[in-house]
Amino acid sequence: SRNNFVIKWIKKTKSYVELSSMYGLLRITPITPEVIRVSFVKGVTEKIGDTAWKGKADTAFSWNAKESKTLVEIATEKVTVRIAKNNGAVCFYNEKKQLLLAEKAEEPRFQEGRCNWIFFDWEKSEHLKAKGLLAADFMDVTAKAKYISYGGKKLRMPLILSEKGYGLAIASKGTVLFCGIRTFGPYIMAEGSQSDYYFISEKNREKLVEIYQRTLTLRYCSQAGIF
């Protein structure tokens, strides 16, 4: 039921903010001023696991968290994240406090077995693209259903880019399905033991891809200089 998503308690550490509901544990981690990690695991006793990608900020930077009766707000100089306490849905705003993206308030996420669905409220007119393997390769996924994972061959996260000035990088080594068809979602489904994605705020597409490549390649690949 929808009541399962109600936020019951909140814990802030130096690296992240955790919000717990009857459905599971949501963690918001500022990675850089432009990049926010959103992780979720189903179950009241479960913990967010480490992945092959960046789990927290490498370099300390300024961000703050505050709480009102209805909201939890986490802000860097570039991004403000608001989580509604009554449903656990996450909304992202740019530095001008303009809404860029919202998870669906009715049911923000669903987890069954190793399949994780995140439901988003994309605007009807919003143009969305998925990054391909080549630098200039972008596939239009507006109002379509497409597999956007690299089939396990490439050690990179699937990346969705919006003309509104943000990107979504999905932290899954398994299958990732993007569905922009309103009748069925819209949603992103990713395989894994937890739901994990990175929100990137940047208007310029080249810069956004640069941030994605610099910040969000696999830890051991960046250390070895592969990317």
Which residues make up each language-model segment?
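Noncatalytic nucleic-acid binding interfaces
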Residues: 1, 21-22
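A low-complexity, Ser/Thr/Gly/Pro-enriched, surface-exposed linker/loop concept
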Residues: 1-10, 14, 29-72, 108-113
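Catalytic and substrate-binding clefts that recognize carbohydrates or anionic sugar/phosphate headgroups
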Residues: 20-21, 66-225
